[in-house]
């Protein structure tokens, strides 16, 4: 059996590939090693896999994950090794998963717009150039967590139109005085922030919200797209829920920067299944 996984900070999509059978697909929480440790990942995987398969039957695991760089990949690998002792394990970045899924063997610009953000240039099966997204605290412009921080700040400062202030308070039970403590008390603040994109989606027709979302994508372009030489020669290809939910605003901003829009998909898992089924 082969396991293929694509993990963001909020959700991991799993595919169990068995010869002559349909893939078994399911989701768990995300496992970004910048925010959770090996023990946390191991416990969660055991809880989610215990009734699905025999762990000893897994021979190969291909895990593509957010945060799996700079030595952090070993955290995920240690967790997987403890659960699946007979498996050979390959850990790659979520950006490479997006590239394989959307571009196949073609070269191009690839991005992730989910809870976090990532960008790169893909060529010959590898990411050959990558601007550091800097993560939740310092960067991740355009991501769900980034958008969430922006709307939380506007609410806390009472800088939103009164009708949006009232709607936000009614939906979440927060006030400008309680929203900041709630944010800092959250166990995983990137996930906590990202959940407020639902409010943005529900109110996207309001000019204040539309401008907030577009400004976040302008920040994305200025910090994570325009730093690539000749970026206008590529099309914008993106994986992630934020690119899907706010596709109209993303396309508007891309056009102002002279960049064509290519493929925008929610998840790379289907493309990864096709890629790795070649091993059967």
Predicted stretch roles:
Residues 66, 94, 241:
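Cofactor-binding loop segments of dinucleotide-utilizing enzymes, especially the Rossmann-like FAD-
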Residues 62-69:
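Polybasic, low-complexity association/targeting segments
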Residues 69-163:
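Phosphate-binding/catalytic loop of phosphoryl-transfer enzymes
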Residues 1-61, 79, 102-109, 150-280:
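ATP-binding/phosphotransfer module of carbohydrate and carboxylate kinases, centering on a glycine-rich
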